[in-house]
Amino acid sequence: MRCQRCGNEDMNYFYQDEGVWYCRKCIGFGRIDVGKEPITRPCMRRRCKCHYTLSYPLTPKQQIAVASIMQYLKEGKDVLVYAACGAGKTELTMEAIQWYLCQGKKVGFAISRRQVVLEIQERMQQAFPMLQVIAVCEGFTDITDGDLIICTMHQLYRYHGWFDLLIMDEVDAFPYRDNALLEAIAM
């Protein structure tokens, strides 16, 4: 037996209810019966003629990093940006976000902490004023779709199969680090 949401195969986490088995490892994200795929809701997709603006220029090294990121993404490769806190990693993602949205693709930005979700949402809304930038975290779950979705790692369960580009920040921090359940939901 295998859960299609979290990948659990440990029988200790399965329970049978009226002849139907379901996974208890990820029950906090809603019940999913064995053999069923996570629910995929339709999402808004529109080709945006968006352009981001920053109130300051990127440094020459940041511009080189952006060019490398874009080269890898256009080749269909995953990218890891490893830099110190405050080095401008969020700004390095904006070119990629713009490129994907202009093609009508769906973009998500996941981060571990609620407060940072709200901060990133505000920064992205300033950089992309013509877009609907949505924050999805504790206390902000009424609207869950927009042009650009900024959410906590825990909220990724809502977006199974949605994102063409998923930017994950602070993957080395609690609660994502060493959490197999959140890793499975994100992938």
Tell me what each language-model feature is:
Residues 158-187:
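SF2 helicase catalytic motif II
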Residues 123-160:
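Inter-Walker segment of RecA-like/P-loop motor cores
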Residues 113-116, 142, 156-158, 172-174:
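Residues immediately C-terminal
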Residues 54-77:
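N-terminal pre-P-loop "Q-motif" helix
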